[in-house]
């Protein structure tokens, strides 16, 4: 018999294997200062493109004031216990009513954390006789939720409607034999590449196949729709989304999440979401803070307008310079380049140390070998000067990449890793 930890000591995993080279700089970096476009990294001022504070609410004075007042009045603990037992308040109910109205649903239910909330939603919605069909590029919280499913699941190629219908047909045939139903899961906005899920095309197939649709709209809520009501409203299909989910961690710059749908489904989830039934209620400081943030989304359209002004300036500028930003049609701005992992590391180091620009880097195995993805997250708080400075820097680093400067800088690391 082996020691349980033997495999842990031998292999840190696909990402952990690079920790000796990456930790503290490329992964687990420490950003300091007030949240926003201008922060500090390792003691230096940086222009930050790596936080999802889309509407600039994280450091908005009205938000900070309400957060401070709520903390002073309630502390960090109130209410204590799970919602079902002793952690329920009228403020939780008020937020749920307002969220439901905002996203055009009958009812909503608060979740204390987005990731575990989504895992629990999937677990609660399906039985072993049901079949799940989901996009292959779904977020990890969806994948982990699907892993709990004892029944069959099918993945379809990303945003590929031919692949989707093929797998939907397989699911329908299987569900006929098991006596179960079908749950389709998509993201409203895919956070890595910035593409909207093809919700309009998906719901059109409801006429042919009897399925229910769950949408994770973490990046669409607050950014899409006339007031930020989300991707479903933006595409005109919100009524066809059976279960709508979003987090407070992005546009609302807070903690928590919610799920919305018809009243009967939400009531069922209220009594069957294990991650909520057996966990502490969302603290009042976050509930009061979310109410304020929602009010600002409802009454300050200029925040969303400023966001999109910045998105358009950035994305148009990148395209004019010949950069490949994929098929993004949202705020998420990916820049695809050809290069190895060592070249990517040298490039990001150059951006941070010599251009003062901080952003997220994505490499293999998340994307294909030989590709580098630099993900830029524009917000309402960025300025035109921030964008123009970044565009100039990107032109400079691309030239260095293409002329082999970064390969030469990390020659030893390249030798160790190979052409990854």
UniProtKB/Swiss-Prot annotation:
GO terms of molecular function: glycine C-acetyltransferase activity; pyridoxal phosphate binding
Pathway(s) served: Lipid metabolism
Ligand binding (pyridoxal 5'-phosphate): 114-115, 219, 247, 249
Entry annotated with the keyword Acyltransferase: yes
EC number per UniProt: 2.3.1.-
Keyword Lipid metabolism: yes
Catalytic activity: isopentadecanoyl-CoA + L-cysteate + H(+) = 3-oxocapnine + CO2 + CoA
Modified residues (N6-(pyridoxal phosphate)lysine): 250
Gene3D superfamilies named in the record: Aspartate Aminotransferase, domain 1, Type I PLP-dependent aspartate aminotransferase-like (Major domain)
Cofactor: pyridoxal 5'-phosphate
Annotated keywords: Acyltransferase, Lipid biosynthesis, Lipid metabolism, Pyridoxal phosphate, Transferase
InterPro entries listed in its UniProt record: Aminotrans_II_pyridoxalP_BS, Aminotransferase_I/II_large, AON_synthase_class-II, PyrdxlP-dep_Trfase, PyrdxlP-dep_Trfase_major, PyrdxlP-dep_Trfase_small
GO biological process per UniProt: biosynthetic process
Domain of life from the UniProt record: Bacteria
Family: Belongs to the class-II pyridoxal-phosphate-dependent aminotransferase family.
Function according to Swiss-Prot or TrEMBL: Transferase involved in the biosynthesis of capnine, a sulfonolipid present in the outer membrane of gliding Bacteroidetes and essential for gliding motility. Catalyzes the formation of 3-dehydrocapnine from cysteate and isopentadecanoyl-CoA (13-methyl-myristoyl-CoA). In vitro, products are also detected when 13-methyl-myristic acid is substituted with tridecylic acid, myristic acid, pentadecanoic acid or palmitic acid.
Name recorded for this polypeptide: Cysteate-C-fatty acyltransferase
Species of origin: Capnocytophaga ochracea (strain ATCC 27872 / DSM 7271 / CCUG 9716 / JCM 12966 / NCTC 12371 / SS31 / VPI 2845)
Name of the encoding gene: capB
């Amino acid at each position: 018999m082996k020691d349980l930890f033997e495999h842990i000591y031998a292999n840190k995993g696909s990402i952990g294997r690079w920790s000796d080279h990456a930790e503290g700089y490329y992964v687990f970096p420490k950003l300091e200062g007030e949240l926003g476009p201008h922060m500090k990294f390792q003691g230096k001022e940086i222009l930050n493109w790596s936080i999802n504070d889309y509407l600039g609410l994280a450091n908005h004075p009205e938000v900070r004031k309400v957060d401070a007042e709520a903390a002073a009045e309630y502390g960090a603990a109130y209410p204590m216990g799970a919602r079902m037992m002793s952690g329920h308040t009228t403020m939780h109910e008020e937020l749920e009513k307002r969220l439901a109205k905002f996203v055009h649903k009958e009812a909503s239910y608060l979740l204390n954390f987005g990731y575990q909330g989504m895992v629990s939603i999937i677990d609660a919605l399906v039985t072993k006789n049901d079949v799940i069909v989901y996009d292959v590029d779904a977020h990890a919280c969806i994948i982990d939720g699907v892993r709990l499913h004892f029944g069959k699941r099918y993945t379809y190629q990303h945003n590929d409607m031919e692949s989707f219908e093929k797998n939907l047909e397989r699911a329908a045939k299987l569900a006929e034999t098991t006596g179960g139903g079908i749950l389709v899961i998509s993201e409203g906005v895919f956070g890595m590449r910035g593409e909207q899920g093809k919700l309009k095309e998906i719901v059109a197939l409801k006429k042919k196949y009897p399925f229910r649709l769950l949408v994770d709209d973490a990046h669409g809520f607050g950014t899409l729709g006339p007031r930020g009501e989300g991707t479903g409203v933006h595409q005109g299909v919100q009524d066809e989304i059976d279960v709508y989910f979003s987090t407070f961690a992005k546009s609302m710059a807070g903690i928590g999440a919610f799920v919305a749908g018809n009243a009967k489904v939400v009531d069922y989830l209220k009594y069957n979401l294990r991650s909520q039934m057996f966990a502490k209620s969302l603290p009042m400081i976050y509930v009061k803070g979310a109410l304020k943030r929602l009010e600002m989304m409802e009454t300050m359209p200029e925040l969303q307008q400023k966001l999109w002004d910045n998105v358009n300036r950035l994305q148009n500028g990148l395209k004019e310079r010949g950069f490949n930003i994929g098929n993004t049609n949202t705020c998420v701005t990916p820049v695809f380049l050809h290069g190895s992992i060592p070249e990517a590391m040298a490039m990001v180091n150059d951006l941070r140390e010599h251009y003062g620009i901080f952003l997220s880097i994505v490499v293999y195995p998340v994307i294909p070998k030989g590709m580098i993805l630099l993900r830029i997250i524009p917000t309402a708080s960025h300025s035109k000067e921030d964008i123009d400075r970044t565009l100039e820097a990107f032109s400079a680093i691309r030239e260095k990449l293409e002329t082999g400067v970064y390969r030469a800088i990390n020659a030893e690391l390249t030798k160790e890793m190979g052409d990854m």
